[in-house]
């Protein structure tokens, strides 16, 4: 009985302290009924928080469409120059890269560790883990263009090419949907190429445990062997805390396997700390098989996850990392 009375007393003290604080603030600011305002603000927060969590991911899509509108304006402004210049889109790429790099810095404090592993010239195949929304790769492409002056081609899922309005964006930033022969041709021409073997399936079905969802895919490894290029593994810390997908549920798994379209809803858009880590390049080896190279690459990406990612991921911890400085050793950070 005594314990209950003590607990009740503690509750009363807490309420009295809050009431007292509100009265002090009312007297200080000369505002009446401050407690009612406070309760109303709490009610609004309770009502709108779920809505905000669902809207934030679509802000990224909004930014993509703003980029597309800018590219259309740029194209029409330079319609006469197009016939005379092979570098028509360089100015647009530079502008868009600067805008996305600014967004990365402000919203995520974005960093790239190991940029020196990207060659100044010549080909390389970049293999990366696919987040629910691969916004980290947009930021990474912007960094490469700004600091290396290079455009990184990327293999995108076929459904992306069917999104209304995206065709110009994909053309300007050199996205392709394969096939393998085209990938080999791009690399043999001396370009950078990025592939996420997990693709949309990994985006939907992986989660805060950061499990790699590649299945038996090894086509990317055969591309690297045929083109005789190194593979650079890549992983972005906290990418699953920025955006979360509900695609791992049975219904959305079935819908994806049936229609090959990502119907699963997403939530997030949280301003978590994002750090992209580039692993040591896996050099070309004429004696290795595609199966062995695929497994070796998967192990390299997994090693980056094990080293740099808290498992399971935690949104609050990822947010707090914005205010912590990690010591950077023996790696160039951008």
Curated annotation (Swiss-Prot):
Acyltransferase activity is specifically inhibited by TMX1 at the endoplasmic reticulum, restricting accumulation of triacylglycerol. One of its GO terms (molecular function) is phospholipid:diacylglycerol acyltransferase activity. The active site is at 130. Residues 72-125 are cytoplasmic. Keywords: Acyltransferase, Endoplasmic reticulum, Glycoprotein, Lipid metabolism, Membrane, Transferase, Transmembrane, Transmembrane helix. Residues 1-50, 147-334 are lumenal. Its main location: endoplasmic reticulum. It catalyses: a 1,2-diacylglycerol + a 1,2-diacyl-sn-glycero-3-phosphocholine = a triacylglycerol + a 1-acyl-sn-glycero-3-phosphocholine; a 1-O-alkyl-2-acyl-sn-glycero-3-phosphocholine + a 1,2-diacylglycerol = a 1-O-alkyl-sn-glycero-3-phosphocholine + a triacylglycerol; a 2-acylglycerol + an acyl-CoA = a 1,2-diacylglycerol + CoA; an acyl-CoA + a 1,2-diacyl-sn-glycerol = a triacyl-sn-glycerol + CoA. The gene is TMEM68. Its EC number is 2.3.1.-, 2.3.1.20, 2.3.1.22. Glycans are attached at residue 5. Catalytic subunit of the alternative triglyceride biosynthesis pathway, which mediates formation of triacylglycerol from diacylglycerol and membrane phospholipids. Synthesizes triacylglycerol at the expense of membrane phospholipids, such as phosphatidylcholine (PC) and its ether-linked form (ePC), thereby altering the composition of membranes. The alternative triglyceride biosynthesis pathway is probably required to provide the energy required for rapid growth when fuel sources are limiting. It maintains mitochondrial function during periods of extracellular lipid starvation. It is found in: Endoplasmic reticulum membrane. The chain crosses the membrane at residues 51-71, 126-146. Belongs to the diacylglycerol acyltransferase family. Highly divergent. Pfam families: Acyltransferase (PF01553). One of its GO terms (cellular component) is membrane. It is a multi-pass membrane protein. This is DGAT1/2-independent enzyme synthesizing storage lipids. GO terms for biological process: triglyceride biosynthetic process. It comes from Bos taurus.
